[in-house]
Amino acid sequence: WDTLWLFLTIIEVCGHTNDVAGMKAGCIIAFVFVLAAWLIFFDARYLNANGFIKSAIIVLIASFWTAFADDICEFLIFGTRQITIKSVNFSDWTSNICVNANVYAIVLVSGIIIASILFVAGGIKAFANKK
């Protein structure tokens, strides 16, 4: 119900003020981020795997969404093709694009490392449970 109410609120507020562009942007942004939340929910609730593997998938979803969700929203709203993470420069923390890219890269690499560790732990646990 919360997802439905989110979209109804966006439609009502923007429709009341005749802000069609705001409604489009709001619905796109809400869809992109609600999709991540629903993927995490379905993984945690319905995936038939142990907790380590579920956690690994959740970490991957969260890190990929953190790294690329803004670029996806920019493309869907404005048609701008950009991959912020391509601007990674760990020696430059002064420009906004480099700071964003550096943070996205750190989150993405950290998420992949953590998820890999969790996948290995999940595999070990699954193998140990089969014996």
Where are these regions (language model features)?
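C-terminal membrane-adjacent module
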Residues: S63-K131
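Membrane-helix interface and helix-disruption motif detector
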Residues: I10-A30, L47-F52, E74-Q82, S95-I106
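Alpha-helical transmembrane segments in multipass membrane proteins, preferentially the mid-helix core
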Residues: V32-K54, T66-C73, S116-G123
